[in-house]
């Protein structure tokens, strides 16, 4: 293996003044260095700076594309034939089940890897000037990947896929003014059917992949234009005026190759051990109990249990997304790029915020489930007030309290305080996702895993 890496390094580094500009060797090198800097700071090669998450995402997208192309040879985008074609794929095609497993698991891993990649960028302040636009591009890519996962989720046309997608698309109906029309446009009618499957198939196999690949290329090019990755530092370190630079080839490229091979090995191992789920055929007349959204939308579904849908989707979720897009302009994250958690105080405030969110979220969910019933306590009041306006006001008050509790006792500066609030919101959302995915049973009632609700 070491010898193979050395030969790969030689292939990259070897050059000749007489080399044909149209040779595959020269073309490949030109392409690579169009989206990669020729020189990188030596300290950015440390694995613990990025954990290879960006490279893993590229590998997972590549696996998605290649396995998706293979799946198209067997898949038929029509309600009855869709399910039957997957049965034939899994039983009659060589390695059909394995190819579908790779596609399924790489899609799920991609969501997690991109989430962690975004956290790494945020906590090292790698979204400030000159990387502000790239932060927005990265968030857009994350949302597009979620859309790609959702459109692909429906394609098996089994009970789980049909009703989980129904739950997700039902959220669109709560957008005032355009929600119902937007829902009908996406589904091609009043409910999921042949038109919806055609739309989702076209989006999943053509529209979204093209946009994702184009934005990924632009994302890497922006990293190159910004001079590569931010140079890692400790909070107490005096910034270097001129970091030590080394050639990307082979120092960076071989490390990326090692990460790519490791990521592929992990996906292939999981795909060998665990099959992608396929339940009974979709039955529009029989809703399973409970009906849950895919795990990456479970946090949003849990929000709908506690907030009026209009407030949960249009106000809380929209404001949170807007705040994340505007983070480079709000003063959050590491004040000096490359410094994890901005400072030693930033580390303490982030840990405190994470612990607070981890405790407050389950307590609030339990109180809302078994104790608080604003609709019953306020008979005659519209639900938009009792289940929307008041809970939202309480939530905003909670955030204000967290801000004050962090700013004053810890004497935190604005970047550390904004960072702690982001940590609080993220941990809260992760907790809501876990609660909905694991601790919700029949009728979306709370229950311990494996215990049936009464």
Language-model regions, residue ranges each:
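Short, solvent-exposed mixed-charge patches
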Residues: 453-454
